[in-house]
């Protein structure tokens, strides 16, 4: 039976366009991993969607004079279109205004309350006397109580990453009017996370976390405290039996992974299909997030699941990225440090962008996109190594009338066998990189394989042998080079799928209509017995230029 694999990535907030930082950190890694697991023949479900509630949305919608639903509709469509332009292999792109979400969120809350994990408390919150209302976190800014950053948001500091309650800010002010805020008593529901410390520590021991964040998560759980999960807002999911209150966005948003799967199942005509991934055994669940979302995905959401009667699937691996910068600075459209996605893709191929973002992904530390690095990698790696290897072999074969190559008609020498073993080892290395969620290492292996193919072709020098009349030896060299190209297409497909399919089409004996690396024909290549026993046939076609030089 194929392994069931559930993949989710942090829901993009319906409050602005996606930029390269979002793509490189979270969404490209999730897409690459989904493609890789499908190549293995696994039963993969990849769910994402828009996060459509929260204070930041109401703030910006008010500024733009738009209704809240109109505002999130606009950005939901933009996000969905962006994912499609980037070729992401999603099974379903949902949203937290989907028809299943509100009821499920309220049910989560009711079960936590019935389990004694929710209690209402009267506490001091920030109040604007000018606006005559309590202001929830994103309506507030002030000085961070940890690092002293003087424009910290009301729920987390964008400078040091600390998260806290808005009441903890020093010198808090309204983001609407700029007036100083006062403290005033009000009532909210609190999630008693401190009562779940032992259960959370036990859970996190069995969950994959990158080394660079594990200590943070364990420390967070050790010092976890109750959190207010309600807000005084009109836009949000109403809290049962608590008039005037809606759920805090970080209580409702993670439940969107489940409600989004419900919506997917309904769209397939099988409303219970979601249970196969969330309630049945034998599922591997991998979640891709940015480090700024870490407390909510590693602590709050697992705690919410642990407090339910239904045994919802808990995450097995949290893949956490650092920040991705543009020329050393944070992406900011308002400050002009921004790349327009549509304009960029009108000038450069999608595979060029995917490759460079993968090669520079912020996996264990902050990294950056620079146009000089983009140009250098495209020209030296994609054109100079990868594309050059494909083109020179196929151009030589076409010029000298080699259009069919078969294992059964060639005689391999020791140098060929040694080369093929190196090729197979690099394929194993690539699989290891993908299993360990490292796009950077995978791109390095891809280029190593292309470089190996170039070195082999140079050393064998078939153009010299052809002059000596040893046509049969040239056929063996071309066979080995094409075998290398086929495996190069396989291991590069998760990252540069268009180019990989183009290679496949140029050497595969299958028809173009059926040429897809997601077929079992490709999946079998991962199996050790296929890697170790060559039984191939290649039908060569005219070479097509995969990559052009970036000026």
From Swiss-Prot:
The keyword DNA repair does not apply. Its main location: cytoplasm. It is an enzyme of class 6 (ligase). Zn(2+) binds at residues 144, 147, 157, 160. It is found in: Cytoplasm. GO terms for molecular function: ATP binding; metal ion binding; methionine-tRNA ligase activity. Its cofactor is Zn(2+). One of its GO terms (biological process) is methionyl-tRNA aminoacylation. It catalyses: tRNA(Met) + L-methionine + ATP = L-methionyl-tRNA(Met) + AMP + diphosphate. Its EC number is 6.1.1.10. GO terms for cellular component: cytosol. Coiled coil: none annotated. Keywords: Aminoacyl-tRNA synthetase, ATP-binding, Cytoplasm, Ligase, Metal-binding, Nucleotide-binding, Protein biosynthesis, Zinc. ATP binds at residue 333. InterPro entries: Anticodon_Met, Met-tRNA_ligase_1, Met-tRNA_synth, Methionyl/Leucyl_tRNA_Synth, MetRS_core, MetRS_Zn, Rossmann-like_a/b/a_fold, tRNAsynth_Ia_anticodon-bd. Monomer. Is required not only for elongation of protein synthesis but also for the initiation of all mRNA translation through initiator tRNA(fMet) aminoacylation. HAMAP family: Met_tRNA_synth_type1. Belongs to the class-I aminoacyl-tRNA synthetase family. MetG type 1 subfamily. This is Methionine--tRNA ligase. It comes from Chlamydia pneumoniae (Chlamydophila pneumoniae).
């Amino acid at each position: 039976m194929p392994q069931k694999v559930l993949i989710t990535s942090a829901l993009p907030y319906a409050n602005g366009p996606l930029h390269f930082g979002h793509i490189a950190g979270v969404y490209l890694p999730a897409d690459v991993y989904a493609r890789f697991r499908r190549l293995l023949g696994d039963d993969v479900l990849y769910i994402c969607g828009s996060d459509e509630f929260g204070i930041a949305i109401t703030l910006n919608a008010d500024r733009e004079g738009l209704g809240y639903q109109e505002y999130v509709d606009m950005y939901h469509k933009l996000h969905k279109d962006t994912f499609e332009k980037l070729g992401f292999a999603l099974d379903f792109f949902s949203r937290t205004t989907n028809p299943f979400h509100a009821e499920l969120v309220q049910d989560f809350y009711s079960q936590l309350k019935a389990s004694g994990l929710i209690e209402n408390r009267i506490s001091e919150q920030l109040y604007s006397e000018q606006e005559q209302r309590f202001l929830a976190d994103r309506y507030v800014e002030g000085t961070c109580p940890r690092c002293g950053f003087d424009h910290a948001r009301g729920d987390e500091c964008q400078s040091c990453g600390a998260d806290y309650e808005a009441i903890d800010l020093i010198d808090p002010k309204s983001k609407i009017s700029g007036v100083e805020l006062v403290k005033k008593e009000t009532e909210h529901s609190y999630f008693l996370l401190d009562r779940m410390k032992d259960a959370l520590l036990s859970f996190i021991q069995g969950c994959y976390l990158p080394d660079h964040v594990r200590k943070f998560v364990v420390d967070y759980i050790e010092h976890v405290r109750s959190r207010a999960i309600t807000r005084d807002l009109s836009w949000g999911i109403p809290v049962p039996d608590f008039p005037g209150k809606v759920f805090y966005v970080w209580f409702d948003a993670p439940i969107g992974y489940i409600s989004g799967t419900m919506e997917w199942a309904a769209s397939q005509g099988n409303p219970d299909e979601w249970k196969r991934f969330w309630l049945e055994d034998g599922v591997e669940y991998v979640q891709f997030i940015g480090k700024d979302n870490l407390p909510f995905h590693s602590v709050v959401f697992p705690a919410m699941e642990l407090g339910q009667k239904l045994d919802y699937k808990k995450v097995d691996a949290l893949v956490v990225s650092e920040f991705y910068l543009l020329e050393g600075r944070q992406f900011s459209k308002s400050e002009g440090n921004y790349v327009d996605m549509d304009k960029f893709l009108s000038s450069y191929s999608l595979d060029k962008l995917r490759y460079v973002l993968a090669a520079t992904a912020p996996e264990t530390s902050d990294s950056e996109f620079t146009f000089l690095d983009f140009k250098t990698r495209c020209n030296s790696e994609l054109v100079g190594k990868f594309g050059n290897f494909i083109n020179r072999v196929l151009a030589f074969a076409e010029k000298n009338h080699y259009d069919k190559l078969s294992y059964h008609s060639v005689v391999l020498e020791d140098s060929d066998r040694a080369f093929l073993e190196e090729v197979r080892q690099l394929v194993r290395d690539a699989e290891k990189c993908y299993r360990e969620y490292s796009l950077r290492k995978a791109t390095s292996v891809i280029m190593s394989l292309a470089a190996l193919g170039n070195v082999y072709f140079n050393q064998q020098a078939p153009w010299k042998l052809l002059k000596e009349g040893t046509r049969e030896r040239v056929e063996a060299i071309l066979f080995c080079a094409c075998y290398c190209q086929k495996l190069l297409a396989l291991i590069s497909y998760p990252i540069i799928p268009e180019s990989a399919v183009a290679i496949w089409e140029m050497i595969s004996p299958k028809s173009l209509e059926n040429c897809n690396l997601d077929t079992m024909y490709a999946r079998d290549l991962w199996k050790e017995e296929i890697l170790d026993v060559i039984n191939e046939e290649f039908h060569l076609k005219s070479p097509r230029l995969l990559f052009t030089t970036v000026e």
